[in-house]
Amino acid sequence: MLNDTSALSRRRFAAGLALGTIAFAMPMRVAALTVEQARGMIDKAVGEINAVIGSGKAESAMIGDFEKIFVKYADVPAIARSALGPAAKQASKAQMSAFTKAFQGYISRKYGRRFREFIGGSVEVTDAKPLKSYYEVISVAKLKGEAPFDLRWHVSDKSGSLKFFNIIIEGVN
């Protein structure tokens, strides 16, 4: 009986050691997202947006720049899936890819045209905090002749890289 117990203990030890070795040998996910990383990413995005606004470029050039910024910092596939709603689950990969590309262009044109409103204004990051499984980065937009308004960016690394997946403007998604 003593032999069976000690053999079982050795087996458990060996199994535990093997599992532990495998766990450490597997590629580990990059360290968890932090408030500083989320805030820093939005600071960079806002800096690039402010540079485009202040560039004096033609609207078409600004729209092209905005699309590059959007693709660089936004989780465009996640946002497109959300915009498509339940139909996204039924769409093929090719359909989702085509929709995502069209959605990316649409958002870039629609909101890129609004850059004119920001000329002479700015967006400033003021705070960041953890929420559920993501971070909220809070900023304030200041436009000429208008009261400052609140912008909240939801940031996550679930897609494999640091991206924003939602913007709330004055409480509206």
What does each model-found stretch correspond to?
Residues M26-A32:
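Sec/Tat signal peptide C-region and signal peptidase I cleavage site
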Residues V35-R114:
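Early exported N-terminus immediately downstream of N-terminal targeting peptides
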Residues G105-Y106, L143, I169-N173:
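Solvent-exposed loop/turn segments at secondary-structure junctions
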